[in-house]
């Protein structure tokens, strides 16, 4: 879970084809996620105490769409401070988690040791995963607020194909690009559906605490469904399934109302817009 975009912000758009070098963007995002990791691990939103006591943090969406993971090698991309990774490890998966934030990875390693689990955590840019993780996996997994931090999905998809064993599964559950078109309060459409430019935002707070002492610029990109699917297909993966969900399993947006336990709508748009999608793709 790496929710991210639109906590409390003002935004502007830049043409990233002109900007060229993304390193400065990745570094700014890393610094911001280092701040967030400290706040998030102590938040009610993540309920770390409940997780330590045995509660699951995975949602019915991914649990219903991924088969038994026992003894399967799983690579978790953009794992934040490791709760989802360690939940999969509890279910028997042999997990390696990757994240850009060194603070988050350090917290993940501490939590892994505290829980007596055997997951491994690697700090690197997700696009450089193949340079840092020298094995292939039965499952590559990523979820909720991850791909928006990447300017181009073709290198991402190629990396995924490289990291998968033949016959391996790639699975993503992600917030729907329609959600990212709106302003913070969901009053009007502010951003393009397609990946046209980098979205630069001045942030205050985070989705677990709008008043947290977290400030800084972040850089993100919107990705259409066709861009995601075509990147995966172009990498040689075969799409097995694509599903859309008319709710969010997390209250990480403003103006949300819980209409059923563990399911949230945007107030005034109840059941009218897709909020999450999932994809299963396999390496033949």
Residue positions per predicted region:
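Intrinsically disordered, low-complexity segments enriched in serine/proline and basic residues
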Residues: 6-14
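Short alpha-helix
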Residues: 208, 219-242
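Class I SAM-dependent methyltransferase SAM/SAH-binding core
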Residues: 73-129
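A short acidic, Gly/Pro-enriched loop at the edge of an enzyme's catalytic core
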Residues: 131-140
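Conserved class I S-adenosyl-L-methionine
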Residues: 16-70, 83, 87, 169-206
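Core SAM-dependent methyltransferase catalytic element
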Residues: 235-237, 258-284
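A short glycine-rich, Lys/Arg-flanked "PGG" loop and its adjoining helix->strand segment in the class I
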Residues: 154-169
């Amino acid at each position: 879970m790496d929710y991210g975009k639109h906590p409390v912000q003002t935004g502007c758009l830049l043409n990233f084809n002109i900007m060229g070098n993304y390193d400065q963007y990745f570094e700014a995002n890393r610094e911001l996620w280092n701040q967030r990791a400290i706040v998030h691990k102590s938040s009610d939103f993540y309920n770390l105490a409940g997780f330590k006591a045995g509660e699951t943090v995975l949602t019915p969406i991914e649990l219903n769409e991924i088969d038994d993971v026992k003894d399967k090698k799983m690579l978790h991309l953009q794992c934040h401070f490791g709760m989802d990774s360690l939940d999969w490890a509890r279910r028997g998966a042999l997990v390696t988690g990757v994240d850009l934030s060194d603070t988050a990875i350090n917290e993940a390693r501490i939590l892994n040791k505290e829980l007596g689990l055997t997951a491994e955590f690697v700090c690197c840019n997700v696009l450089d995963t193949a340079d840092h993780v020298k094995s292939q996996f039965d499952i590559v997994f990523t979820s909720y607020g991850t791909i928006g931090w990447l300017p181009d999905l073709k290198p991402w998809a190629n990396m995924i194909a490289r990291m998968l064993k033949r016959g391996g599964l790639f699975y993503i559950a992600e917030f729907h690009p329609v959600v990212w078109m709106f302003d913070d309060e969901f009053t009007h459409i502010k951003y393009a559906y397609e990946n046209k430019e980098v979205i630069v935002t001045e942030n205050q707070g985070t989705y677990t605490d709008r008043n947290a002492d977290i400030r800084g610029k972040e850089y993100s990109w919107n990705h259409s469904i066709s861009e995601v699917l075509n990147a995966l297909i172009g990498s040689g993966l075969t799409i097995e399934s694509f599903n859309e969900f008319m709710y969010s399993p997390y209250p990480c947006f403003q103006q949300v109302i819980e209409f059923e336990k563990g399911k949230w709508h945007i107030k005034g748009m109840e059941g009218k817009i897709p909020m999450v999608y999932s994809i299963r793709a396999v390496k033949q």
